[in-house]
């Protein structure tokens, strides 16, 4: 699991979150993902369960990405709200989540909206861990489809064409949260063009983007050298 995925899972397990149904599934899914992600995941989960461990993690985050936990909480809360607004107001029948990671939004929405076909796309290792976790939590709805693909080197259009659960004539919402900063501009352009060519019905997009630093590369506003080092060591640089 990448350092970014570990951090996002940690944000879902942080005790300060409100106890809603969606947050509960996100927390349980994140815990399962950390347990299945080697020694780093298990160590992080242990630290999160201890008050002194959370103090230590909070200190490290203040030295690397101050405010990142609050950012993740705010972002996920508002994205979930925007997605549900689109589903209900635009009569969305299909949700494609690009780079779904270990987020529980797709599982939550597929259970809530039985008419909604949800297709989650991520790398094979992530999909494998997430499928096992959802099975254990009994949270895998029939209208939730998970597809393994590396979109930095594969065609989204071909993947969708080969997916029996994909319906090109359904009003579709695409969610790309925390994905675009890992793709070069030509890859982003190709992905958007392939989506437009794949869907014959109304198509909507909700995506996150990062501001560019003076060097011209994506970067968090308060990103410090410790975060730079972690991204470099885990081979997940923003492009």
Which functions belong to the PLM regions below?
Residues 86-91, 163-172, 199:
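Glycine-rich phosphate-binding loop signature in dinucleotide/nucleotide-binding domains
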Residues 161, 166-187:
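A short SAM/SAH-binding and catalytic strip from SAM-dependent methyltransferases
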Residues 146, 155-159, 182-197:
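A short, conserved alpha-helix within the catalytic core of class I
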Residues 233-239:
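Short alpha-helix
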Residues 133-168:
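S-adenosyl-L-methionine
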Residues 109-115, 166-168, 197-200:
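Short, conserved loop/helix-junction motifs that constitute active-site signature segments
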Residues 173, 192, 197-214:
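Conserved beta-strand signature within the Rossmann-like core of class I S-adenosyl-L-methionine
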Residues 1-96, 102-147:
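Rossmann-like AdoMet
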């Amino acid at each position: 699991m990448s350092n970014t995925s570990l951090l996002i899972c940690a944000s879902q397990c942080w005790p300060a979150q409100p106890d809603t149904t969606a947050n509960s599934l996100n927390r349980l899914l994140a815990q399962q993902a950390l347990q299945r992600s080697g020694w780093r995941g298990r160590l992080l989960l242990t630290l999160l369960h201890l008050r002194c461990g959370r103090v230590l993690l909070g200190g490290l985050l203040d030295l690397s990405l101050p405010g990142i936990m609050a950012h993740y909480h705010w972002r996920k809360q508002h994205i979930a709200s925007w997605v549900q607004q689109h589903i209900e107001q635009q009569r969305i029948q299909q949700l494609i989540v690009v780079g779904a990671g270990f987020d529980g939004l797709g599982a939550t929405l597929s259970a809530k909206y039985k008419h909604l076909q949800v297709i989650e796309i991520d790398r094979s290792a992530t999909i494998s861990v997430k499928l096992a976790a959802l099975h254990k939590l009994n949270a895998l709805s029939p209208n939730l489809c998970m597809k393994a693909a590396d979109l930095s080197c594969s065609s989204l259009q071909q993947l969708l064409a080969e997916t029996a659960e994909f319906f090109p004539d359904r009003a579709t919402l695409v969610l790309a949260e925390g994905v675009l900063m890992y793709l070069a501009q030509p890859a982003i352009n190709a992905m958007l063009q392939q989506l437009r060519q794949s869907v014959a019905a109304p198509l909507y997009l909700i995506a996150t983007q990062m501001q560019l630093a003076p060097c011209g590369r994506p970067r968090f506003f308060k990103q410090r050298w410790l975060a730079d080092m972690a991204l470099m060591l885990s081979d997940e640089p923003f492009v």
